[in-house]
Amino acid sequence: MWRPEFIPFLRSRRISLNIDLSLAALLRRSSNIHRRRERRVYNEVLSTETRAKRPSYDLQNFHFQSGGWMTDDSAERYDTQVEVLLNGAANAIRRQALPQLHEAFAGRDQRKLRLLDIGCGTGRFLDFVKQTWPRLQTIGLDMSEAYLKHSQRHLKRWTRTGLVAGKAEAIPLPDNSQDAVTNTFLFHELPPKVRRITIRECARVLKPGRPFGNPRFTPTRRSSRLRRALRALPAELSRAVLLELHY
């Protein structure tokens, strides 16, 4: 039997409500998700309109998730899904880059520094950066207009923060213009060739000797326990939920 105590993150009443709503949405779509998985359907978001706006690798249902990374619904559920999967540790993983940035920024005037976050998603990492360096000039780059809209909402209390729609493999910024480049949970979604191009682009826009932050996560015993708990659900339903939660 799945119980909230499996996940300390769920003990917050407000967060629990958000997760309940997110999981409820997953359950409503579970049969469609299961059919998508069984039929290996992964490109429902591909259309003539989207093909003109995005590279082919981005036009798929990532992890069989409904809408890929393209819809408001996906952006609304994203943070909850990642927190559940990582047992409430997603923000801790994001903060792993802060000590490296602190070392790089030590003794320097933050007002004169610039940071670029590629694949900024819903803006959670940039919010941590601004909490630490509120006068730092930051830019968030993402291909998803829906996710950028949520970033704008999360970052609205800050100044000196910009958001740009664009590809990480074609960063629309000048050479040697950034004092730091960061990303979280991006590279495993990119094809190998695009990863290499993206790394070269990051090196291009970075000033010499400046840091590239790439926090990562590894599966834990607790996340495995969550998976076991979800498997207590009916087989088709648990597979569907895990597919949408998988990251």
Ranges and model annotations:
Residues 169-181:
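A short acidic, Gly/Pro-enriched loop at the edge of an enzyme's catalytic core
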Residues 116, 122-170:
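Class I SAM-dependent methyltransferase SAM/SAH-binding core
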Residues 77, 88-111:
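Conserved alpha-helix/loop element of class I SAM-dependent methyltransferases that forms part
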Residues 196-208:
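A short glycine-rich, Lys/Arg-flanked "PGG" loop and its adjoining helix->strand segment in the class I
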Residues 113, 175-177, 210:
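Surface-exposed loop/turn positions
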Residues 196, 211-247:
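C-terminal alpha-helical "lid/dimerization" subdomain adjacent to the S-adenosyl-L-methionine
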Residues 180-193:
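A short SAM/SAH-binding and catalytic strip from SAM-dependent methyltransferases
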Residues 1-68:
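N-terminal auxiliary segments of SAM/dcSAM-dependent transferases
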